Amino acid sequence: MVTPTTIRTVDLRSDTVTKPTESMRSAMANAEVDDDVLGNDPTALRLEKEVAEIAGKEAAMFVPSGTMGNLISVLVHCDERGSEVILGDDSHIHIYENGGVSSLGGVHPRTVKNEEDGTMEIGAIEAAVRSPKGDLHHPVTKLICLENTQANCGGRCLPIEYIDKVGELAKKHGLKLHIDGARIFNASVALGVPVKRIVQAADSVSICLSKGIGAPVGSVIVGSKKFITKARWLRKTLGGGMRQIGVLCAAALVALHENVAKLEDDHKKARVLAEGLNRIERLRVNVAAVETNIIYVDIPEDPKFGAEEACKSLEDVGVLVIPQATFRIRIVLHHQISDVDVEYVLSCFEKIFHS
């Protein structure tokens, strides 16, 4: 095992920290570009066409971030202020997107408990639906949102059968289904199922190009042609219309072509790291829950040495991780982490938690 006598930097804060590869930089430098607001950037059009085909949807649109992609999607489906969206209480849209659906869109979030596996209980979702024929004191439900993989639950993959059932429930009540698929490629690789099958029941999907596959910037949202037409208006309204975005889309195309195949290796390294951490006497990892590239490490409940202090000690030896809770640390693997890095991280954790 590598010992932490020689400090190296291993950045496990997120899979968004990756640096553009040489092939990405070359593609960016040589990208064919035009004005995307006018709808003429050929590289953007190529990326959008390819992602739409991968997801099995009619059309797609590049957006600067996943937060904007989710916000636009919710606002297209909930086109009347005061509409309601049902989503997980531990979902990214609910916790990490500044409440944009309510503050900017006037959409009311109605949360349902996320189970440990990332799902929401079907009966609980149905019980949360509020009809336009119901009590006039309540907002009207228009949309259900799922997240796949579910990050706060540890990068868990939602089963296809479950997504299909939620889709059936949405149709039964005249609702739309949006999937925050920031790490949908991780789910696809882990489940061994094409993306288009996973999102078959969804009316729209937001797919991150940075998380998982390591492009430097952006997300793509997919849906029907009608959905994307409305989404373009909202993107412009929110300031997300950009000009020669082919420079960014070129890197994303490289990520799609080169890095999806690396995700399986990311998942294997995550499993090795999780098992190694779980063997350290004072640490606990639910290894069975490590399905993709995210690990949560529970540390001893020492009021003088919580996750904040542990992360600082790890940073001092070059290991960059994030406190998830008072006594929990989050680790995210990506394609620029090597086997040697994994060994080094294990040795650093062992040294810190045995000292």
UniProtKB/Swiss-Prot annotation:
Its EC number is 4.1.2.48. Keywords: Lyase, Pyridoxal phosphate. The modification N6-(pyridoxal phosphate)lysine is found at K211. Pathway: Amino-acid degradation; L-threonine degradation via aldolase pathway; acetaldehyde and glycine from L-threonine: step 1/1. It comes from the Eukaryota. InterPro entries: ArAA_b-elim_lyase/Thr_aldolase (IPR001597), Low_specificity_L-TA-like (IPR023603), PyrdxlP-dep_Trfase (IPR015424), PyrdxlP-dep_Trfase_major (IPR015421), PyrdxlP-dep_Trfase_small (IPR015422). GO terms for biological process: threonine catabolic process. SUPFAM superfamilies: PLP-dependent transferases (SSF53383). The keyword Lyase applies. GO terms for molecular function: L-allo-threonine aldolase activity; threonine aldolase activity. Expressed in roots, leaf vasculature and flowers. GO terms for cellular component: cytosol. Disulfide bonds: none annotated. Disruption phenotype: Lethal albino phenotype when homozygous. Pfam families: Beta_elim_lyase. Its cofactor is pyridoxal 5'-phosphate. It catalyses: L-threonine = acetaldehyde + glycine; L-allo-threonine = acetaldehyde + glycine. Threonine aldolase involved in threonine degradation to glycine. May play a role in the removal of L-allo-threonine. Belongs to the threonine aldolase family. This is Probable low-specificity L-threonine aldolase 2. It comes from Arabidopsis thaliana.
